[in-house]
């Protein structure tokens, strides 16, 4: 009896061994991530640090790298005007906000970001300028008029509408786009309010390829602020690289603190169907500056309650490129007034949210099944699995080739069990578990059956990746527990993917281990 108990304890111990999870290894990789494996961070320079400057933000870029960020989108950096201090009311498109620093300071920020293999995108406001912008007096012909008077777009009293029927205005705006590439070596533009009826599709159709080709060897990316797939369909073929999955985010906002899974599945199916024939990527998020302040002035906790955790997992594993808004990693418990640059309280800690994000972003970087593509047909397939015994539980897989991820979410208000069928049985790695993630990142080997019963906490989540650990592979003839270390002298000549599976010569982008060394295939 004692011998049997000892064997049982040993077996249980072996099944719960925590192995190297590689989260920091992946996020801090010196390699630049390929398109399709990237995460974007929206930063308001004035809110991001107490100093509110480019220089102070530059000092924190290493922290963003460790979080898993690849692209820093800077909200408008131009001098503000118009009377209400909106960053989207620019006085001069070729100057920086003096409170943030100089163009040289911005360039230094970009240089440091590039050293960390991160990109910097600027917020571009093509539709209007501040009512007291320099052009109002120097080039009044750049503005649209009615009855001889300049026009406030959408009745926004702090800005004047620009006139894209004037070729001189078009040339001036394009010159501004080139200016920041020349002066600060920026990598892309997030373009505000591209659905404006005052900006013709032909403008984008001409400008985007021109700017992309402006500097030899330089890639410039364009993100358009619109749901092009559904609302701004006239812009489908003008060249934007990414749009906003607005309808999906609006659905999440309306979901709020709901506790059933059926609506989430419907949201997902609507998103996937609407994205099925697109030729550009999509950005998914649960909050940004508009949702956080303009639309509701509600924090993530106020808007979603404890749903903020599983909905984060849902949004960042379902489709597209993940966006995180500055401060979201602290739990998102501030409504940040970006008109007055409310400072983020970095002393507020939410280890559960932070470690969840770190893990999700590491998986985004390393796992092909979580990649995104501008060609809809090349995106990993999403398959919703049958769930019985708990209406609050949603389960789905994403699959690309032999790479597969399983996500299980419990949107319910009580801990419980649910039986999920349709799983590819065998070895899986549990990378993200809501019950333990607050204590730190981890990775655990487990075996799942085709029909598996899960015990999962209320508002809980788990993310599994198909495969086994190399250190638990019975065919491994070398101790390779520390394979990611460049100092490891392993002579094992086989290739292992990030989940520990032996693979043939790698063909899919990602992180591999070979002879004890990291190999990153772009």
Where are the language model's segments positioned?
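Sec-dependent N-terminal signal peptides
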Residues: 4-13
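Sec/Tat signal peptide C-region and signal peptidase I cleavage site
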Residues: 15-19
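Substrate-binding/active-site clefts of carbohydrate-active enzymes
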Residues: 21-71, 76-185, 199-202, 206-218, ...
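Active-site-proximal helices and loops of the catalytic beta/alpha 8
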Residues: 22-23, 176, 182, 190-285, ...
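Asparagine-centered strand-capping/turn motif at beta-strand->loop junctions
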Residues: 408-412
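C-terminal beta-strand-rich structural cap/linker in extracellular carbohydrate-active enzymes
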Residues: 444-475
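Residue-level detector of functionally pivotal "anchor" positions at catalytic/ligand-binding pockets or at interdomain
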Residues: 468-499
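C-terminal tail/sorting-segment detector
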Residues: 511-522
């Amino acid at each position: 009896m004692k011998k049997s108990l000892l064997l049982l304890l040993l077996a249980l111990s072996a099944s719960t061994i925590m192995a190297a999870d590689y989260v920091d290894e992946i996020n801090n990789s010196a390699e630049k991530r390929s398109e399709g494996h990237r995460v974007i961070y929206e930063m308001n320079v004035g809110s991001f640090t107490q100093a509110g400057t480019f220089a102070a933000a530059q000092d924190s870029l290493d922290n963003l790298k460790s979080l898993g960020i690849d692209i820093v989108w800077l909200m408008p950096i131009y001098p503000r005007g118009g009377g209400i201090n909106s960053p989207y009311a620019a006085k001069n498109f070729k100057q920086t906000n003096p409170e943030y620093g100089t163009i040289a300071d911005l360039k230094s920020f970009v240089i440091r970001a590039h050293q960390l293999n991160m990109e910097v995108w600027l917020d571009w406001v093509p539709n209007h300028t501040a009512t007291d912008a320099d052009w109002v007096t120097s080039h009044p012909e750049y503005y649209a008029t009615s009855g001889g008077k300049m026009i406030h777009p959408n009745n926004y009293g702090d800005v004047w509408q620009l006139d894209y029927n004037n070729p001189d205005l078009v040339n001036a705006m394009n010159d501004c786009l080139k200016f920041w590439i020349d002066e600060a070596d920026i990598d892309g533009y997030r373009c505000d309010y591209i659905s404006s009826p005052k900006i013709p599709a032909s403008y984008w159709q001409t400008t985007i390829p021109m700017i992309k080709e402006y500097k030899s060897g330089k890639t410039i990316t364009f993100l358009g602020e619109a749901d092009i797939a559904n609302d701004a369909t006239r812009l489908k073929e003008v060249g934007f690289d990414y749009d906003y999955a607005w309808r999906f985010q609006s659905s999440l906002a309306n979901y709020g603190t709901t506790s059933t899974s059926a609506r989430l599945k419907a949201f997902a199916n609507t998103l996937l169907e609407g994205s099925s024939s697109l030729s550009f990527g999509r950005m998914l998020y649960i909050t940004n500056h508009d949702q956080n302040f303009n639309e509701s002035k509600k924090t993530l906790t106020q808007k979603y309650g404890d749903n903020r955790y599983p909905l984060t997992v849902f949004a960042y594993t379902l489709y597209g490129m993940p966006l995180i808004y500055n401060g979201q990693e602290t739990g998102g418990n501030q409504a940040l007034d970006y008109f007055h640059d409310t400072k983020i309280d970095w002393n507020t800690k939410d280890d559960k949210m932070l470690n969840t994000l770190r893990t999700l972003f590491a998986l985004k970087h390393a796992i092909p099944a979580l990649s995104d593509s501008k060609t809809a047909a090349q995106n990993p397939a999403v398959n919703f699995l049958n769930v019985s015994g708990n209406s609050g539980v949603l389960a789905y897989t994403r699959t690309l080739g032999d790479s597969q991820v399983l996500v299980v979410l419990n949107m319910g208000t009580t801990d419980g069990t649910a039986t999920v069928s349709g799983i590819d049985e065998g070895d899986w790695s549990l990378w993200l578990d809501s019950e333990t993630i607050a204590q730190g990142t981890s990775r655990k080997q487990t075996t799942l059956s085709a029909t598996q019963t899960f015990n999962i906490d209320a508002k809980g989540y788990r993310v599994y990746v198909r495969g086994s650990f190399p250190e638990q592979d019975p065919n491994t003839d070398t101790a390779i527990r520390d394979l990611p270390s460049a100092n490891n002298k392993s002579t094992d000549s086989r290739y292992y993917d990030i989940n520990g599976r032996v693979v043939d010569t790698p063909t899919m982008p990602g992180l591999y281990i070979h002879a004890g060394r990291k190999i990153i295939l772009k």
